[in-house]
Amino acid sequence: MNSIVNFSQQLIQNFQEVSQKTAADSSNLKAFAYLGAGLAMIGVIGVGAGQGYAAGKACDAIARNPEAQKQVFRVLVIGTAISETSSIYALLVALILIFVG
């Protein structure tokens, strides 16, 4: 009977030590999740610069040839939608890291 009591006390002590370590580790994990979310959003900078460059070139093309406005606009919208997907994925990863991680 005494061995069972000692075992249960040792088990409770081990559980308390593990829970204290887990509490300290979870704060570090949250900090790394925020850091990862920030790093994931760095990828959006390139997307914004690329879309701005493409829009500028589309304006130049329309200024040179106004009759091709519909074709240039269609290509611009498709290109913008394709390039925007990477920033949406970066935002999704950041939100998952912040709220789930």
Swiss-Prot record:
Family classification: Belongs to the ATPase C chain family.
GO molecular function, one term: proton-transporting ATP synthase activity, rotational mechanism
Pfam families to which the protein is assigned, alphabetical: ATP-synt_C
Source lineage: Bacteria, Bacillati, Mycoplasmatota, Mycoplasmoidales, Metamycoplasmataceae
Gene Ontology cellular-component annotations: plasma membrane; proton-transporting ATP synthase complex; proton-transporting two-sector ATPase complex, proton-transporting domain
Protein role: F(1)F(0) ATP synthase produces ATP from ADP in the presence of a proton or sodium gradient. F-type ATPases consist of two structural domains, F(1) containing the extramembraneous catalytic core and F(0) containing the membrane proton channel, linked together by a central stalk and a peripheral stalk. During catalysis, ATP synthesis in the catalytic domain of F(1) is coupled via a rotary mechanism of the central stalk subunits to proton translocation.
Membrane topology of the entry: Multi-pass membrane protein
HAMAP family in alphabetical order: ATP_synth_c_bact (MF_01396)
Membrane-traversing stretches: 31-51, 81-101
Compartments, as annotated in UniProt: Cell membrane
Name of the protein this chain belongs to: ATP synthase subunit c
Site feature: Reversibly protonated during proton transport: E84
